UniProtKB/Swiss-Prot annotation:
UDP-N-acetyl-alpha-D-glucosamine binds at residues 166, 196, 290. One of its GO terms (biological process) is regulation of cell shape. SUPFAM superfamilies: UDP-Glycosyltransferase/glycogen phosphorylase. It comes from Staphylococcus aureus (strain USA300 / TCH1516). Cell wall formation. Catalyzes the transfer of a GlcNAc subunit on undecaprenyl-pyrophosphoryl-MurNAc-pentapeptide (lipid intermediate I) to form undecaprenyl-pyrophosphoryl-MurNAc-(pentapeptide)GlcNAc (lipid intermediate II). It is an enzyme of class 2 (transferase). It catalyses: Mur2Ac(oyl-L-Ala-gamma-D-Glu-L-Lys-D-Ala-D-Ala)-di-trans,octa-cis-undecaprenyl diphosphate + UDP-N-acetyl-alpha-D-glucosamine = beta-D-GlcNAc-(1->4)-Mur2Ac(oyl-L-Ala-gamma-D-Glu-L-Lys-D-Ala-D-Ala)-di-trans,octa-cis-undecaprenyl diphosphate + UDP + H(+). The lineage of its organism: Bacteria, Bacillati, Bacillota, Bacilli, Bacillales. It is found in: Cell membrane. Keywords: Cell cycle, Cell division, Cell membrane, Cell shape, Cell wall biogenesis/degradation, Glycosyltransferase, Membrane, Peptidoglycan synthesis, Transferase. This is UDP-N-acetylglucosamine--N-acetylmuramyl-(pentapeptide) pyrophosphoryl-undecaprenol N-acetylglucosamine transferase. The gene is murG. The keyword Glycoprotein does not apply.
Length: 356
C-alpha cells in the first residue's frame, strides 16, 4: 500500500490544499500522515478536521529575507527540524512527500531528499515563496496555481495545474448558516475575512463603519485569533475569531466578501461566484505576493482590490457601493472560470509524477 506524507503550514493557505487531497488519498486506499509545526495553525486544522491521520510535530524556524539576529537562532531550529523529520520519515517510510509550502516544509523536504523520498511541492501564489524556492532544489516537481508562475521556475520541474478546491466547499447549507448567525434571509450578507492572522486595521475600519454597513448588509466578521471585540454587539453583526467546520455554511449565505488576497481563498470565492473586495497584505507584512494575487484577479474582472494603506472608512463604503453596482458583471466574469484539475485528477498526476 502506498503511503503519502503531507507537510505545509503557517497559514490557512498552506494547509487548505492538503485538506482537499488527504481525503482523496484515504478514499483510494492510500495511507497518509502529516508533518507540521508544534504550535502552528496546521496542527489545529489537521487534528480537528482529519483526526484519523497521524500528525507529527517538528521543530521549525522562520525564513527571513532580511538580516536579523533571529536568523541565527532559527538556523538551529531548522537543523533540528531536519533531524525530527528524518526520524519520522524513517519510521513511517512514505513512498512520496507532498509539500504545500510554508516555513515548516523546508526541513521536511530536505529530510525526504536525504532519504531518497520523491517530493512534489505546490505553489499557490503568482510568484514563488521563499520556502518553495529553497524546497524546489530538493524536489522532483512543483505544481502551480497560476500559469504565469511557470515563468519564474525551471521548465523541467514545473507544471501548471490550477487551483485545487475542497470538495465540501459547494456543499454549504444556507439553512444552517442562517440558523448559526440568526440572520434574516431577506437581507444581504457581507463576510469579512482578515486572514488566519487577522488585520487590526481592517477590523477597526469595519467596526468604525458598522452602522453604515448594517444599513445594507448583515455582517459576519472573522477577526483573527485574539482580535474579537466582545464589547461590540449589534443586531445583524456576528464575530468569530476563526471558523473551521461551519465556514461552508457561512459561505452559502454570503453575498459579498471583504478578504485578504491569499490565492486559495480567492479561488474558493471565485468557484462560489461571490463578488470580492480584496485587501492584500502590504509590503511591510509580506513579500508582496498578495498584492500580485489581488491585482491579477482584479485585472481578470473577478474582484476589486485596494491596498490596505489606502483603506479608510469612507473608501471602504465607496468600494463596496461600486462593487454592488457592478455585481452582475463581476458574476458573469466569474462564470468564465473553469477548474483545470479536479482533486482526483491532481491526485492521479501526483502518484504518476512521483513514482514513475
Amino acid at each position: 500500500m502506498t503511503k503519502i506524507a503531507f507537510t505545509g503550514g503557517g497559514t490557512v493557505g498552506h494547509v487548505s490544499v492538503n485538506l482537499s487531497l488527504i481525503p482523496t488519498a484515504l478514499s483510494q486506499g492510500y495511507e497518509a500522515l502529516y508533518i507540521g509545526s508544534k504550535n502552528g495553525i496546521e496542527r489545529e486544522m489537521i487534528e480537528s478536521q482529519l483526526p484519523e491521520i497521524k500528525y507529527y510535530p517538528i521543530s521549525s524556524g522562520k525564513l527571513r529575507r532580511y538580516i536579523s539576529l533571529e536568523n541565527a537562532k532559527d538556523v538551529f531550529k531548522v537543523l533540528k527540524g531536519i533531524l525530527d523529520a528524518r526520524k519520522v520519515l524513517k519510521k513511517e517510510k512514505p513512498d512520496l512527500l507532498f509539500s504545500k509550502g510554508g516555513f515548516v516544509s523546508v526541513p521536511v523536504v530536505i529530510a525526504a531528499k536525504s532519504l531518497n523520498i520523491p517530493t512534489l511541492i505546490h505553489e499557490s501564489d503568482l510568484t514563488p515563496g521563499l520556502a518553495n524556492k529553497i524546497a524546489l532544489k530538493f524536489a522532483k516537481k512543483i505544481y502551480t496555481t497560476f500559469e504565469e508562475t511557470l515563468n519564474y521556475l525551471p521548465k523541467e520541474k514545473a507544471d501548471f495545474i490550477g487551483a485545487t478546491i475542497r470538495e465540501d466547499l459547494k456543499n454549504g447549507n444556507a439553512h444552517n448558516g442562517y440558523q448559526l448567525t440568526g440572520f434574516n434571509e431577506n437581507k444581504k450578507v457581507l463576510l469579512v475575512m482578515g486572514g488566519s492572522l487577522g488585520s487590526k486595521k481592517l477590523n477597526s475600519i469595519i467596526r468604525e463603519n458598522l452602522d453604515a454597513l448594517l444599513q445594507q448588509y448583515q455582517v459576519i466578521h472573522l477577526t483573527g485569533k485574539g482580535l474579537k471585540d466582545a464589547q461590540v454587539k449589534k443586531s445583524g453583526y456576528i464575530q468569530y475569531e476563526f471558523v473551521k467546520e461551519d465556514l461552508t455554511d457561512l459561505l452559502a449565505i454570503t453575498d459579498t466578501v471583504i478578504s485578504r488576497a491569499g490565492s486559495n481563498a480567492i479561488y474558493e470565492f471565485l468557484t462560489l461566484r461571490i463578488p470580492m473586495l480584496l485587501v492584500p497584505l502590504g509590503l511591510d507584512q509580506s513579500r508582496g505576493d498578495q498584492i500580485d494575487n489581488a491585482n491579477h484577479f482584479a485585472d481578470k474582472g473577478y474582484a476589486k482590490a485596494i491596498d490596505e494603506e489606502q483603506l479608510t472608512a469612507q473608501i471602504l463604503l465607496q468600494e463596496l457601493n461600486e462593487m454592488e453596482q457592478e455585481r452582475t458583471r463581476i458574476i458573469n466574469n466569474m462564470k468564465s472560470y473553469e477548474q483545470s484539475y479536479t482533486k482526483e485528477a491532481l491526485f492521479d498526476k501526483m502518484i504518476k509524477d512521483a513514482l514513475n
